[in-house]
Amino acid sequence: MYPGSGNYSYNNRPSMPPPGFNGDGQGYRQEYGNQYGGGYQQQQYQDQYQGENRGQYQGQYQDQPEYGRPPSGMVRPPSSIQQGNGQQFQYSQMTGRRKALLIGINYIGSKNALRGCINDAHNIFNYLTTYCGYRPEDIVMLTDDQREMVKIPLKENIIRAMQWLVKDAQPNDALFFHYSGHGGQTKDLDGDEEDGMDDVIYPVDFESVGPLIDDTMHDIMVKSLPQGARLTALFDSCHSGTVLDLPYTYSTKGVIKEPNMWKDVGSDGIQAAMAYATGNRSALFSSIGNMVSSVTKKQNVDRERVRQIKFSPADVIMLSGSKDNQTSADTFADGQNIGAMSHAFISVMTRQPQQSYLSLLQNLRNELAGKYSQKPQLSASHPIDVNLQFIM
C-alpha cells in the first residue's frame, strides 16, 4: 500500500514520486537562485525553530526500557592518525564546532505524499539540541511546509545547504546530516557502483531539475572534509544503503561486508524458476540473461579501485534505513507519523546513550526487526574499529 491510499501504518515509501507531482497543486516557483547572494547565510535560519514548536516532541523517548549494558571495554576513538588501506585517516574527537542540516520532505499535495518526514526532521532537531550539544542557531532545517522559498527543499537549496554544512570545517568538528524523504536509483554512469545503479534522493522539484545522486552528495559532503572532521549522516529513505558512496560497509558481526554477486538477482531468479516450471523456454533464457548481466556488472567493478577513490581521511559515518535494494517504512508511533529509521535511531540512542558502532547497528536492526523488512546499514569513509564508542 502506498502513502495516501488509505490506511497508513507500516507501509513502504515508494522508490520515487510518480510523474505529475507539483507540490501543492500549483508547483514551486523557480525564482529562488538570487536569494542566496552568493553564499549560505546562517542568520536566515536562527529563528526558524523557536517558541512553541521547539520542545513539542520532548519526553516521548525518555521513559522507555533500556537496552543491556554498554559493551565492556568500550573506549573513545583515538586522537592519533590511523592507517587503513594504505592511507591515513583520523577519528574526530568532537571537540570543535557543531553544525547540522536536517531535511524532511512530505511531498505535500502529491499522489505519493509522505506523512512522517517533516516530523522526523523536528524530532531529530529536538534530539540534537537536547542530548548532543547542538545549538539551534547552528542547525539548518529544510521542509516543504515552509513559507520562505529559501527553506523549501528544492534541489538548489539542498545543494547550497550541504555546502554550508561542510564550509570551513576543521579537525574535530562534529557535523550532522539527516534526510527523510523519497529515495531511489538511477543508472550508474561512472562505474563506481557494484549493482550498476546510483542511489538518489528526490527534492521537491525533482521533475524539473532531476534527483540528487550519490556521486554529487559524496563530492560535496565527503570529499571536501579535512582529515579529522566528523560527518554523521542519517538517511531515512528507500535504496539508501550506499547513498553517500562510502567504501566500507559493516555487518552486524563487525566485519566489512563483501557483496554476494548472486544475492540480488531477485525477481529475475524467480522468473527463471517459473519459466522453467511452465516450460516457457523464451522467458527462461531471457531471465537467465538478465541474471548473468546483473552479476557481470558487479564483477566489472574493481572494488579496491572504488575504495581508493571513495576513501576519505575525514571521519564520515553513515547510518541508512535500508539496503540499496530495499524500501524504508513510513509509519505511525508515539502519536505521530514518522519514518521508522529516524524513530529507531532516536529511541536506541536515548535508551542507551553509550553505544559502540557495532552495538548501535545491532540495536537498530533489533528495533526494526519483526515490524519491517528493511535492514539498517552502517558504512564509513575509512576502516573503523566497530568496538569503539559511537560519539556525535
Curated annotation (Swiss-Prot):
Active site positions, chain numbering: H182, C238
Composition-biased stretches (Polar residues): 1-14, 53-63
Record carries keyword Protease: yes
Molecular-function annotations in GO: calcium-dependent cysteine-type endopeptidase activity
EC nos: 3.4.22.-
Low complexity: compositionally biased ranges: 41-51
Keyword Flavoprotein attached: no
Principal EC category: hydrolase
Region feature Disordered, mapped onto this chain: 1-87
Function description: Involved in cell death (apoptosis).
Protein name, as recorded: Metacaspase-1
Phylogenetic placement of the source organism: Eukaryota, Fungi, Dikarya, Ascomycota, Saccharomycotina
